[in-house]
Amino acid sequence: GLCRMKIITMSEMFIHPSVFFILGGLLIPILRGRGKQSYMVVMALLAFLAVVIMPHGTYGIYEFLEWQLTFGNVDKLSKVFAYIFCIMGIIGIIYSIHVKNDGELLAAFYYVGGALGVTLAGDFLTLFLFWEIMAFSSVFLIWYRKSEFSVKVGYRYLLWHVTGGLILLAGIIIKYNLSGDLTINHFPFHGWWPTDLQSLASFLIVIGFIVN
């Protein structure tokens, strides 16, 4: 039979905006001068454009071992936050044009990429992975200040993050063991204190976010 080619319209396109920060950031140490500055601005603008053309729906679904990872869960709320993080990224890049330290620039790129990943994650494992990228990028941003105070603050933040991350992971594991599903949905709370394992999982997940 004849091959059929489907024309993909703008409303059907999904490119994860974090790609422009996480993968795009890898070229930062290679580039120099104005070329680097222009490149960073272009990457941030492309990420913003990716959010503009993102259709509502579920995208980027991959099977990993026995888990289903969903990288793109797009609705009105997630799109609003994606816009916010992209705009923050653009402003931050323009503000940091004078920064010469490639490590600091790379950490900033990874922070925004992690934030976008968290915003669009459709399952808790994907959310946790991007949350870790976001959190560790924050630590390196603090450490790149290279003062005695920033080193102390960075270690303190790292301690809190590891604690919060373990609590969050415990909640995710309990949820998965109970339901066999990592999809992000409602949190079944019954009052302020968990009364069963299902609400305990939700409680730990929320506490993990708060601690972080």
Identify the role of each PLM range.
Residues L2, K6-L106, D181-H186:
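Transmembrane helix-loop-helix hairpins at membrane boundaries of multipass inner-membrane proteins
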Residues T9-F20, V74-F85, F124-S137, Q198-F209:
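Structural signature of hydrophobic alpha-helical transmembrane segments
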Residues F14, E104, K146, P194, ...:
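Alpha-helix capping and helix-loop boundary segments enriched in small/acidic/polar residues
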Residues I22, C86-G89, I93, Y111, ...:
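Hydrophobic alpha-helical segments
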Residues L23, L27, V80, I84, ...:
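Residues within alpha-helical transmembrane segments of multi-pass membrane proteins, especially transporters
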Residues P29, I94-K100, V139-E148, V206-I207:
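Helix-loop junctions at the membrane interface of multi-pass solute transporters
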Residues E63-E66, V153, L200-N212:
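Short helix-boundary/re-entrant hairpin motifs in multi-pass inner-membrane proteins
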Residues L106-Y110, G114-P194:
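Alpha-helical multi-pass transmembrane bundles of energy-transducing inner-membrane proteins
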